Amino acid sequence: MENYQLVLASTSPFRQQLLEKLAIPFSTLSPNCDETPLEDESPQQLVLRLAESKAQSCQINQPSLVIGSDQVCVINGNIVGKPHNRQNAIAQLTAQSGQSIVFYTGLAVYNSETGETRSCIDEFKVHFRPLTQAQIERYVDKEQPFYCAGSFKSEGLGIALFEKLEGKDPNTLVGLPLIDLIDLLAQQGMQVLG
């Protein structure tokens, strides 16, 4: 299946950087799907549905494997979104101080030729240090994590906020579980290492 094109259904520069680690040429497309949660939809159901929807929403004219991914952050059973501004980022980090949060990342690979979609969910736990208000404000002002779920960038200074990380793939926390992606691509006939 070496004639398949690899497409990332995302405009996220973070996901693009992660996919570049696999050293496979790929293109990106902006997915076109409604990301509104359904009534009574669990975080796991939401990320799986959205990952599949993103992968399937791209208009493709050649045989391609299209990657879709979606992530939510959950604290005390509630989905935490992107803060979008300083005040909300500080509020999120204050609520997360000394707490554990869970990231659920849905991943899907859609084969545009066969119509088959393979998907999975990866879970990653983040345990926050107890943080002072001054530490939180200093972090937010330095890194401005306004478009990151949970109000931090784990690939940057955000690592200073954590006491412990739990999960099989640290890439999951940034938004694209590469270990699972390698498996899903192999199931569709694309071997990362040839």
UniProtKB/Swiss-Prot annotation:
The keyword Cytoplasm applies. InterPro entries: ITPase-like_fam, Maf-like. The active site is at residue 70. Its EC number is 3.6.1.-. GO terms for biological process: nucleotide metabolic process. It catalyses: N(7)-methyl-GTP + H2O = N(7)-methyl-GMP + diphosphate + H(+). One of its GO terms (cellular component) is cytoplasm. It is found in: Cytoplasm. Keywords: Cytoplasm, Hydrolase, Nucleotide metabolism. It comes from the Bacteria. Its cofactor is a divalent metal cation. GO terms for molecular function: nucleoside triphosphate diphosphatase activity. The record marks 14, 71, 155 as: Important for substrate specificity. The keyword Flavoprotein does not apply. Belongs to the Maf family. YceF subfamily. NCBIfam families: maf. Nucleoside triphosphate pyrophosphatase that hydrolyzes 7-methyl-GTP (m(7)GTP). May have a dual role in cell division arrest and in preventing the incorporation of modified nucleotides into cellular nucleic acids. This is 7-methyl-GTP pyrophosphatase. It comes from Vibrio vulnificus (strain YJ016).
